[in-house]
Amino acid sequence: MEGSAKASVASDPESPPGGNEPAAASGQRLPENTPPCQQVDQPKMQKEFGEDLVEQNSSYVQDSPSKKRKLDVEIILEEKHSEDDGGSAKRSKLERGDVSEDEPSLGRLNQTKRKLQPQDDEVPQKLQKLEEGHSSAVAAHYNELQEVGLAKRSQSRIFYLRNFNNWIKSILIGEILEKVRQRKTRDITVLDLGCGKGGDLLKWRKGRISRLVCADIADISMKQCQQRYEDMRCRRDNEHIFSAEFITADCSKELLVEKFRDPEMYFDVCSCQFACHYSFESQVQADTMLRNACGRLNPGGYFIGTTPNSFELIRRLEASETESFGNEIYTVKFQKKGNYPLFGCKYDFNLEGVVDVPEFLVYFPLLTEMAKKYNMKLIYKKTFLEFYEEKIKNNENKMLLKRMQALEQYPAHENSKLASEKVGDYTHAAEYLKKSQVRLPLGTLSKSEWEATSIYLVFAFEKQQ
């Protein structure tokens, strides 16, 4: 990483090099002759998906042996408590992969010609039942997650990984709110889509917004989110805090506009963190999610979020000898290789103590194309590595990384031990120390944690005038 100070942050030599995606996968517009969203020819898009994956896979094979990932920012981790309470059940998706240098070519994609379902009433009854079953499973999973205090979270194996993801979100949210303030200084309204237990409430307070609508499928999570909000208000009697409403709904099947207290409400920002991929079970659900996210945005408003990178997931899957990959922190299991439909491409994801629920692959060029229906333009899409490398150059962002304990101290303090006991999980930090003249300690993520978080990307769309 670049920056005035130096530190080793998860410089994983086996993790995939960033910035090698083909144009269609890197957040750029699709070819101008691509049909409108509602008229997208699915077999054609499916073919483009396959071609993109093959190109992506080839570029990684060429680059991975010679490129060493080095995240270098020198951080001394001193605080014992994170300034930003991210929430124990925020949708932190994480994947990884010990990827070999000789990756097999991708299998043939399913080219079955079938039309996109334009309306809910055209979805076969059997499919509707399957979707209802999956939605119930997602809601049940997040409802069953227990609230965990700060002391307990600090003992978690993924404590730093979750803080790192939380830092990514903090920077993303903060910068987008600053963009909004360039055109309006008051009455900023936000929709938090898939808000979970309210892990981003503190971010919205710090962002000095005026009004927040939280929506999530899990009713117990929503009650906990509302309680967090009430607790926040009680702790800050003399400080203005945004008004809020809380909606329990499946945001991929129900229209939120029908549930708003104010049916004429519009938003400046919609944030969907680690959640939009659940909607890609079907075209109808993905479109409903986008309608909720973008349909009520003001001109110049933003749809922001984080989601798994489909190219990285498939790359690691194809490099695996089985239908699954992962490490001691997380696992991802697909049903089979070589068949990656645009919708309903399910995989099972497990993250230590946080997530254990089916998810769906999001082909980002398709998401970009579908968003055009709501007059949305992609303004950027970056991997977590690319986002980190860019934002860590700012000293304020660097200090926030420290305050949030988003990196682990290496070497460990004499009275403590490293988060991972796995052999080789800190070789990147040890090697960096040998090669660099830096003062100790360093801030880093273990190799296992970096393998998990490095499959994610950050995105931002803007509502056109």
Swiss-Prot record:
Primary location recorded for the protein, binned into one broad class: nucleus
Regulation: Methyltransferase activity is activated by RAMAC.
Feature: compositional bias, Polar residues: 55-64
Subcellular location as annotated: Nucleus
Catalytic activity, reaction form: a 5'-end (5'-triphosphoguanosine)-ribonucleoside in mRNA + S-adenosyl-L-methionine = a 5'-end (N(7)-methyl 5'-triphosphoguanosine)-ribonucleoside in mRNA + S-adenosyl-L-homocysteine
Molecular function as annotated in GO: mRNA 5'-cap (guanine-N7-)-methyltransferase activity; RNA binding
Binding locations of mRNA: N165, N166
Catalytic activity, EC: 2.1.1.56
Residue stretches spanning the membrane: none
SUPFAM superfamilies (alphabetical): S-adenosyl-L-methionine-dependent methyltransferases
Subunit structure: Interacts with importin alpha, leading to stimulate both RNA-binding and methyltransferase activity. Interaction with importin alpha and beta is required for its nuclear localization, importin beta dissociating in response to RanGTP, allowing RNMT-importin alpha to bind RNA substrates. Interacts with elongating form of polymerase II and RNGTT. Interacts with RAMAC, this interaction significantly enhances RNA-binding and cap methyltransferase activity.
Protein name in the entry: mRNA cap guanine-N(7) methyltransferase
